Amino acid sequence: CLGVGSCNDFAGCGYAIVCFW
């Protein structure tokens, strides 16, 4: 659930955590 680069699911978190492009 860590990292940046997507507005979609992060590694199976089920929701966006951060939204950097």
Curated annotation (Swiss-Prot):
GO molecular function terms attached to this record: protein kinase inhibitor activity
Highest taxon of source: Bacteria
Keyword list, A-Z: Antibiotic, Antimicrobial, D-amino acid, Disulfide bond, Protein kinase inhibitor, Thioether bond
Disulfide bonds: C1-C13, C7-C19
Modified residues (D-tryptophan): W21
3-cysteinyl-aspartic acid (Cys-Asp) cross-link, chain position(s): C1-D9
Annotated GO biological process: defense response to Gram-positive bacterium; negative regulation of protein kinase activity
Record's function text: Inhibits chicken myosin light chain kinase with an IC(50) of 8 M. Does not inhibit bovine cAMP-dependent protein kinase or rat protein kinase C. Antibacterial activity against the Gram-positive bacteria B.subtilis, E.faecium and S.aureus. No antibacterial activity against the Gram-negative bacteria E.coli, K.pneumoniae, P.aeruginosa, P.vulgaris, S.sonnei and S.typhosa. No antifungal activity against C.albicans.
Name the record gives this protein: Tricyclic peptide MS-271
